[in-house]
Amino acid sequence: MPGAPGSLEMGPLTFRDVTIEFSLEEWQCLDTVQQNLYRDVMLENYRNLVFLGMAVFKPDLITCLKQGKEPWNMKRHEMVTKPPVMRSHFTQDLWPDQSTKDSFQEVILRTYARCGHKNLRLRKDCKSANEGKMHKEGYNKLNQCRTATQRKIFQCNKHMKVFHKYSNRNKVRHTKKKTFKCIKCSKSFFMLSCLIRHKRIHIRQNIYKCEERGKAFKSFSTLTKHKIIHTEDKPYKYKKCGNAFKFSSTFTKHKRIHTGETPFRCEECGKAFNQSSNLTDHKRIHTGEKTYKCEECGKAFKGSSNFNAHKVIHTAEKPYKCEDCGKTFNHFSALRKHKIIHTGKKPYKREECGKAFSQSSTLRKHEIIHTGEKPYKCEECGKAFKWSSKLTVHKVVHTGEKPYKCEECGKAFSQFSTLKKHKIIHTGKKPYKCEECGKAFNSSSTLMKHKIIHTGEKPYKCEECGKAFRQSSHLTRHKAIHTGEKPYKCEECGKAFNHFSDLRRHKIIHTGKKPYKCEECGKAFSQSSTLRNHQIIHTGEKPYKCEECGKAFKWSSKLTVHKVIHTGEKPCKCEECGKAFKHFSALRKHKVIHTREKLYKCEECGKAFNNSSILAKHKIIHTGKKPYKCEECGKAFRQSSHLTRHKAIHTGEKPYKCEECGKAFSHFSALRRHKIIHTGKKPYKCEECGKAFSHFSALRRHKIIHTGEKPYKCEECGKAFKWSSKLTVHKVIHTAEKPCKCEECGKSFKHFSALRKHKVIHTREKLYKCEECVKAFNSFSALMKHKVIHTGEKPYKCEECGKAFKWSSKLTVHKVIHTGEKPCKCEECGKAFKHFSALRKHKVIHTGKKPYKCEECGKAFSQSSSLRKHEIIHSGEKPYKCEECGKAFKWLSKLTVHKVIHTAEKPCKCEECGKAFKHFSALRKHKIIHTGKKPYKCEECGKAFNDSSTLMKHKIIHTGKKPYKCAECGKAFKQSSHLTRHKAIHTGEKPYKCEECGKDFNNSSTLKKHKLIHTREKLYKCEECVKAFNNFSALMKHKIIHTGEKPYKCEECGKAFKWSSKLTEHKVIHTGEKPCKCEECDKAFKHFSALRKHKVIHTGKKPYQCDECGKAFNNSSTLTKHKIIHTGEKPYKCEECGKAFSQSSILTKHKIIHSVEKPYKCEECGKAFNQSSHLTRHKTIHTGEKPYKCEECGKAFIQCSYLIRHKTIHTREKPTNVKKVPKLLSNPHTLLDKTIHTGEKPYKCEECAKAF
């Protein structure tokens, strides 16, 4: 009832509550279809009012619409509703769903019943509006009830949502129909109002303008909200916290923070929100819908607010200016946030940690740190984030999308902020200038950080150690050192960190991902900061300069570290041993020494390290990567510091000068070491021997001498070293890399020190002179070694045999003789060596490389020392002369060996038999005779040998390997020496000349053998048959005749040979290969020796003449065989029948008669032969080939011997013309006569086996 306590007055319901108004501009945006649709909707709204029983006068707008007139210029009348005589003038078809109509009626009745009006009911029989007067009192009650129930009298059947107005919008949502379409972009909408709003985007009209700032808006309501900003009026105040707000909506949102109310719940995941807009935004995560698309760059957004914020980027408009500092912003919210900087207020405080913030949003973000919640998860890799913005940024990593492109250089970026920063490079603008030094910056934040450098102010002080910092973040990071707290733990490996950023960086190690790639060199990095640091390498920029010495650095951190050098301050002290350090990082590394803890382990080799940086450096060893390359010489380094140190070599720059003596150095560390020389101080003393040192490092090195410890071991060969530097030098041996090249002669070296020494050769400068003999040297160390010659001092004595040496290195080499140890093994052939230098020399054999070439004859060598020795041959120089007999030698070693002849001294005596030897090597070989030991056994055939080298040579027989191949003819050899000899055949070079007869030879060994002819000395005698030989190898070959041993067996046919060379020749039979081809007639041969013999046919030369009868021959071997005719000697006797032969080959052929063995079989007809030559002859029958042609008459022959016989027809020569031989007959037919007496029939027919 009116006037009752608690009754609420309410204004009358008007037609405006259910109408939509248009301005002229808005109405013009609609096409004809949309205008007609508007008329239908407005008429429907009017009918709905009448349907609900609200008797209204017909407004002019409805009249206009019914008449088809435009509504925007009509004057609207407010029509007062009458008492609730509820009436409907419309038919059932007005409602698309009968249940929807019923539900609205039920809600009205239910609402009235709650208010105590049970007699109320909906009536459909009201004749006129006058009938409603009798119910005036009832209407008032209804009006009160409607107000009490928040005016929500319409309920939706689908979701039971209640509305205070009847809503066509709600109906359309359930139908899912989008009937309103935009002509410009074809986008569809549920409601007409949404389409109208959308159309404003295309026309971009802002007709409502703010008088204060001049900013324009599209709607009057937005302008009204905007005006509140200028008033500063905040009428909505919350009593609990005192916060005031300009808008009631903001006030309501804020209240929920205190109450914790989250009424808006997501049906998909159950998550609840304070605001419906947050729920709407959240729902798009599930749907992935991005309805707002930017026409400029194509980027899509889920919410209109984000879309509007984004659009400002393209216009670059910044209408909001700060009155304090003049800085402008795109959005007012950004200006509002900025203003707090000037006030310094931080009203939002966290009770947990006491930290205060200027904005509530920042506080909210901070609170997540305490909760540890990460609700935003990446679907690609599962990585979780605290904020959605971070997830958005992260997603770009997977897509690789870079939509933001620079118009200047075409470079693309994944985020607009990065593009914005990049653009400054092209403009070169640095608007933020430092008043102190004039340095300019791109951003104000960078300027603020820079200013602290000039003030020197460090307001953030550590309470534990007193260390001060410029920024609070640095102090926070520092504090973790004292507490030891590491709250951030890695789930993969369990490692803990002080800061979350460190954990984040660490996690990338497990993923192995490196999304940040350098465009210059293609190198990839796991973090953008590391990429930025790396990029400085390419630019070479060093912006951070030291004011003391002028040295420049790429990073400020390096400059900070450097500055301590000048101050000499060491504030970080070790509590265990009292040692002080300049930097806390150095102290931290040092502390590990006391704990011995090595937490960082290499996954490749299992090696552990004290800190992660050393592990990271170590890992490069396994990858072999050397990203830092010198532009001068191309040498690459694993670390940038090494490259920096190396560069000083090329520049020759030595900025660090000693004030005492003026000596300059490339690095400050070298100068620091040098200065100690002038002070004479040696504070570091050895407790073992009392020796003092100027540096602790020198003492540490010295101590190893007493302990004998060699902690640095080579992974390749197992060799151990006392110092890491020696190991580093040693490692180069395995790589064979020679990065240091001489510009004068092009020679390369492994180490720069070697190159430096070499360069002196070109300058011929010898600064270090000996006072005794006036001899000069290139280096001080060489002079010191030389001086020992004059003193005769040999301080290094062998404990085993008492032999003394001038240098420790020589003693070390000598000691291996007694141990017999050969730790250096060749991976190719298994051969072992006592010293790595010997192994290194040996390895060259397998590579076949010979970089050292003789300028005189072009001969190449694998080692420079070999070249030097060879060059003496051409010069003929023999600088080493024997004082006893005057004999001169080319090499000092030869003179030393020779001297023993005069002294007759044989210091090396055998304890078994008393036999003495001049050299220990000879004694060592001799001793094996007494032991009878042959410890080196072949696993293939069981044969045993005295030494490993002989075994290694023997093993090649079984493997059949011939690694040394001739580039000319393709022939392969087991040993390099054999290949060297062979090569001389192609070159025809014979540098070794006999002084007696002038004969030339390919190699020195052949010359040596030849010289014995002149002396007639045959020192090596056979014990079996008393035959003597010039050399030991010839004797060894001869002995096989008596033993009958044939160790070299053919795998194809089983034939055995006494010598490997014969087996090699034999093998060609099976392969059929003929690699040696005659250039004259194209005839091919299996062996080069055969080709050489053949070539004589074309030349017609016969240089080898018999002194007895004057007959000439093509080669020396034929002459040797011929000479036996004159002597009548037949040393080769058959054991079966006693028959003797002049040549071993004839004996071999003869033996076949007794064995009846025919190992050589024809593949065509199956016929077998005793000898391969017979098989070869036989094969011509099948081929019909006659390669030997007579030049006189053109007649061709199967064999060369037939051709030779034939040629005598033309010359009329008697082939067996023999002079001065009374025992032999001049006619070949008389030789036939001799066979009659012997009964011998050596010539057998291959077809019928008849002998002649």
UniProtKB/Swiss-Prot annotation:
Gene3D superfamilies: 6.10.140.140, Classic Zinc Finger (3.30.160.60). GO terms for molecular function: DNA binding; zinc ion binding. InterPro entries: Ikaros_C2H2-ZF (IPR050589), KRAB (IPR001909), KRAB_dom_sf (IPR036051), Znf_C2H2_sf (IPR036236), Znf_C2H2_type (IPR013087). Keywords: DNA-binding, Metal-binding, Nucleus, Repeat, Transcription, Transcription regulation, Zinc, Zinc-finger. PROSITE patterns: KRAB (PS50805), ZINC_FINGER_C2H2_1 (PS00028), ZINC_FINGER_C2H2_2 (PS50157). A zinc finger (C2H2-type) spans 180-202, 208-230, 236-258, 264-286, 292-314, 320-342, 348-370, 376-398, 404-426, 432-454, 460-482, 488-510, 516-538, 544-566, 572-594, 600-622, 628-650, 656-678, 684-706, 712-734, 740-762, 768-790, 796-818, 824-846, 852-874, 880-902, 908-930, 936-958, 964-986, 992-1014, 1020-1042, 1048-1070, 1076-1098, 1104-1126, 1132-1154, 1160-1182, 1188-1210. May be involved in transcriptional regulation. PANTHER family: ZINC FINGER PROTEIN (PTHR24404), ZINC FINGER PROTEIN 501 (PTHR24404:SF100). This is Zinc finger protein 729.
